[in-house]
Amino acid sequence: MNSLFPVMVGGAVGAGARHLVGQAMLARFGPGFPWWTLSVNIVGSLAMGLLIGLLARSGTGGETTRLFVGVGMLGGFTTFSSFSMEFWLLFERGQSVQAGLYVVASVVGALLACGAGMILIRQLPA
């Protein structure tokens, strides 16, 4: 039970943040393309890379931080199920090029963002 609480609280914070980002992106760009999911998944991947880099650098493990931020907040903030659904919505609307670009941008963007976060932390002075 000790590990469940930080995950639950972090998940609530992350899900709330995702909702706010989604509302802002929808108001800014409209519903034509799932910019909200693309942005939260890339930003969340960058944050995960930063977190992993910081935890590795600290050498203390930071189990509670990992549970709260990595599993809870970032698990609630990013969303693979929405990514999957939005791909199929684009595809079914006949927007196969946009659907393909969405997959590439999401996967490549998230991988690059996570790696960038880890590299950024490694560049900081000890």
Swiss-Prot record:
Mind listing the UniProt keywords for this protein, alphabetically?
Cell inner membrane, Cell membrane, Ion channel, Ion transport, Membrane, Metal-binding, Sodium, Transmembrane, Transmembrane helix, Transport
Q: Where does the UniProt annotation place the signal sequence?
A: none
| Highest taxon of source | Bacteria
> Which positions bind Na(+)?
G75, T78
Q: Name one GO cellular component term.
A: plasma membrane
What is this entry's stated membrane topology?
Answer: Multi-pass membrane protein
- What influences the activity of this protein, per its activity regulation comment? Na(+) is not transported, but it plays an essential structural role and its presence is essential for fluoride channel function.
What compartments host this protein?
Cell inner membrane
Q: Which Pfam families match?
A: CRCB
The protein's predominant localisation is membrane
Show the catalytic activity. Answer: fluoride(in) = fluoride(out)
- Provide the transmembrane region boundaries: 35-55, 71-91, 101-121
- Tell me, what is an example of a GO biological process annotation in this record? cellular detoxification of fluoride
Q: Which InterPro entries match?
A: FluC
Query: What GO MF terms are annotated?
Result: fluoride channel activity; metal ion binding
Tell me, in a sentence or two, what this protein's role is: Fluoride-specific ion channel. Important for reducing fluoride concentration in the cell, thus reducing its toxicity.
Family statement drawn from the similarity comment of this UniProt entry: Belongs to the fluoride channel Fluc/FEX (TC 1.A.43) family.
Which NCBIfam families is this protein grouped with?
crcB (TIGR00494)
What protein name applies here? Answer: Fluoride-specific ion channel FluC
Q: What species does this protein belong to?
A: Sphingopyxis alaskensis (strain DSM 13593 / LMG 18877 / RB2256) (Sphingomonas alaskensis)
Q: Which gene encodes it?
A: fluC
